[in-house]
Amino acid sequence: MTERLYFRQLLAGVDFAVGDRETGDALLIDPAYRPRELIDAIEVDEMTVRGVVLTHYHADHAGGNLAGHYIKGTKELLETTDVPVHVQAAESPWVTEASGVERRSLVAHESGDVLRVGQIGVTLIHTPGHTPGSQCALVDGRLLSGDTLFIDGCGRTDLPGSDPAEMYHTLTSRLADLDGTTWLYPGHRYAAEPTAQLGVVRRDNAVLAPMTAEQWLATFSR
C-alpha cells in the first residue's frame, strides 16, 4: 500500500495531505492557512481534494479567530471545493462555533472509524484532552497527531474544553497500543526534527514518562 500512498507535509508541516496516487484522491488535514494554495499545491501533483480532516477546532487548525486575527481556513476552502469535513463527534459544535463551517458540511465520527480515500485507509482515533473532540489520524504507519502529542510535550490543557485528566488517559491508554515504529507527525514543529518514531518519543518525551495520574496531573496540568 505504501507505493500508492500520497503523503505530503504542507506549509512547514502545519498542514498535511494524504491520498491514493493511483486514483488521485486526497484528504487535507487541518487546512487553516492559505487553503487555496494548498489545493493548488496538490493539484500540481495531479491530486484532487475529496475531503478534509480536522484534528480539533482551534483556529490555527480549522480556521477562525486567533488573537484578534481571523483565519479563513476551512470555511474558505469549502467556498472553492464542496467536500465533507470529517470531525470527531464531540468536536462538531466547537468547530461550527469557532470556524463558521456549517453543520451540514461536517461528518461526525467515533474513535476507530476508517475513512477511505481511494484504497488508502485513514483510521481516526479520539484523543481528548487538548479539546473534547481532538482526534489523530493514523495512515500507513504515520500518526498525524494535531495538538494531542508533540515530539517534545503535549497539547495545552488550560484552554476552553481542555481536560488534563483526559489528556493523561489519552497518552497512557488511547495511544499506548500503537507500534513504536509508527512515525509521529505533530501539528506544530516544536522540536528540531519534524517527525520521530513513537518508540523514541516514548523514551524521550517527559509527558510519556511512567507515572500515576496524580503524579502526572501535579507535574503537567496547566
Task: List the predicted regions and their residue ranges.
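Hydrophobic residues at beta-strand termini and immediately following loops
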Residues: 10, 109, 198
